[in-house]
């Protein structure tokens, strides 16, 4: 499909796969189909027969309890882990494991913002953002500088360009991490718990920046989060990992007012306050 970013098809994923080395990183946004984990020992299954599709320019949030495989899904999409079974399609194309030639092309088109920001401690903000651009030789020095400045302006961190990570608040570190990923011009951006550890002030300041980025540049985004209100504030669909599979995607309000088992579990506090 021309408008398809990511598709996961019949994916099975096991805990043992998460310690693997870099595999084949997707070239773009994708779809998962029947993704499964280990069949030999179901205790170690994280995902079993999961399917998910995502259109170009779409944003989706993945919710669910800790330890159920949400972050593992992101690692798999980014190429840091591989499914035991199933297929991942990036922009409508399946890239088999043996296509190692596609690795470098692929990983430049998938950005991954880790929960802890993962900034290089001895590099200033400007150099943290420029590092992957320089490593992959993505332009001349002048072109890289322009991209870095655009990323800093987008996430409003230019005033902190010459500061080191330890001099920044947690909220500002997350902004820098997002700027670093965005500067690579990814077609698919993965975010793992972007609001974790933020106070209300920093959270309120971060979400409009993410919203502005996706609307201005049509970036396709997958957000793994415990903060389900993100789906409401970004007006995007929300899916849950439930019984090792993805639910159908629905709006925040749908889940909030649903009488399903998932809604009663995940929205208990919000429903009780209505």
Task: State what each model feature region is.
Residues 78:
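Helix-to-loop junction immediately C-terminal to a conserved catalytic motif
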Residues 142-159:
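Conserved ABC ATPase "signature" region
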Residues 185:
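Conserved catalytic motifs of ABC-family nucleotide-binding domains
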Residues 164-168, 172:
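Conserved ABC ATPase signature
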Residues 189-192:
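Catalytic Walker B motif of ABC-type/P-loop ATPase nucleotide-binding domains
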Residues 95-111, 255-258:
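ABC ATPase NBD coupling module
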Residues 86-95:
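Conserved ABC transporter NBD signature motif
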């Amino acid at each position: 499909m021309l408008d398809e970013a990511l598709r996961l098809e019949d994916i099975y994923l096991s805990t043992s796969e998460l310690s693997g080395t870099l595999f084949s990183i997707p070239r773009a946004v994708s779809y998962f189909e029947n993704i499964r984990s280990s069949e030999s020992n179901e205790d170690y299954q994280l995902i079993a027969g999961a399917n998910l599709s995502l259109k170009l320019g779409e944003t989706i949030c993945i919710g669910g309890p800790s330890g159920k495989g949400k972050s593992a899904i992101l690692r798999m999409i980014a190429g840091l882990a591989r499914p035991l079974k199933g297929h991942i399609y990036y922009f409508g194309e399946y890239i088999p494991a043996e296509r190692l030639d596609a690795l470098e092309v692929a990983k430049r088109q998938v950005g991954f913002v880790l929960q802890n920001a993962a900034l290089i401690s001895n590099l200033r903000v400007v150099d943290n953002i420029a590092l992957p651009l320089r490593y992959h030789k993505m332009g001349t020095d002048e072109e890289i500088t322009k991209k870095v400045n655009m990323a800093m302006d987008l996430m409003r961190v230019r005033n902190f360009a010459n500061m080191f990570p330890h001099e920044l608040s947690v909220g500002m570190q997350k902004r820098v991490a997002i700027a670093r990923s965005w500067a690579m011009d990814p077609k698919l951006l993965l975010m793992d718990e972007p609001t974790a550890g933020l106070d209300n002030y920093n959270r309120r300041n971060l979400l409009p920046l993410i919203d502005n980025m996706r609307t201005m540049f049509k970036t396709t985004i997958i957000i793994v989060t415990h903060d389900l209100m993100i789906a409401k504030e970004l007006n995007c669909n929300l899916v849950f990992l439930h019984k090792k599979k993805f639910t159908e995607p629905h709006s925040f309000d749908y889940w909030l007012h649903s009488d399903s088992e998932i809604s009663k579990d995940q929205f208990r506090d919000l429903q009780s306050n209505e």
